[in-house]
Amino acid sequence: MSAAARVLPKAVTFVTGNAKKLEEVRAILGSSVPFQSLKLDLPELQGEPEYISKEKARIAASQVNGPVLVEDTCLCFNALKGLPGPYIKWFLEKIGHEGLNNLLKAYEDKSAFAMCIFSLALGPGEEPITFVGKTAGKIVPARGPNYFGWDPVFQPDGFEQTYAEMPKSVKNNISHRGKALALVKEHFASASYTVQSNDST
């Protein structure tokens, strides 16, 4: 529990250029976290997912000179010891849904987990706080509308539908992103951040 509410100089900037991701984040967070979105060209880093996310948050906080929220998503195949992991975006661009299935062709184990890491840096020089959400499932031949990344090939455990086949409200409830954002909401509720209003809207 925080002793006193921290005053943020401005609303949190959620760094993304992905319209579908922004739509999901808005739907899940609602008005619980005041944020604006901005596309920034952040360097593509290599390393463990949490390290990548924190580094991006540090860089973004310096660029916007204020609080930022960045997100990194991984799709980890257990048979491949966690790959493609944080590099899923490039794998998908290069080999598509069928290629992702082909990666597991030689393996009986089609299990995978989706992981989402949000990092919140309250300003330049501040140590980012991370929030991690995971959903276990398996990789299947693509089913459902091809609107959003690898949604058509990921079927969460306990469901007969892929992410792509689910109603958005169901997906947002059980997804890796939904779970991570639930922790973000919890953090904002307990930290009682307030945004400085020189110019209130």
UniProtKB/Swiss-Prot annotation:
Keywords tagged on the record: Cytoplasm, Hydrolase, Magnesium, Manganese, Metal-binding, Nucleotide metabolism, Nucleotide-binding
Cofactor note text: Binds 1 divalent metal cation per subunit; can use either Mg(2+) or Mn(2+).
Domain of life the protein comes from: Eukaryota
Enzyme Commission no: 3.6.1.66
Cofactor(s) essential for the protein: Mg(2+); Mn(2+)
Top-rank EC class of the record's enzyme: hydrolase
Matching InterPro entries: ITPase, ITPase-like_fam, RdgB/HAM1
Gene Ontology, cellular component aspect: cytoplasm
GO-annotated molecular function: dITP diphosphatase activity; ITP diphosphatase activity; metal ion binding; nucleoside triphosphate diphosphatase activity; nucleotide binding; XTP diphosphatase activity
GO biological process annotation, one example: deoxyribonucleoside triphosphate catabolic process
Assembly notes: Homodimer.
Function: Pyrophosphatase that hydrolyzes non-canonical purine nucleotides such as inosine triphosphate (ITP), deoxyinosine triphosphate (dITP) or xanthosine 5'-triphosphate (XTP) to their respective monophosphate derivatives. The enzyme does not distinguish between the deoxy- and ribose forms. Probably excludes non-canonical purines from RNA and DNA precursor pools, thus preventing their incorporation into RNA and DNA and avoiding chromosomal lesions.
Listed PANTHER family: INOSINE TRIPHOSPHATE PYROPHOSPHATASE (PTHR11067:SF9), INOSINE TRIPHOSPHATE PYROPHOSPHATASE/HAM1 PROTEIN (PTHR11067)
Protein name: Inosine triphosphate pyrophosphatase
Organism: Zea mays (Maize)
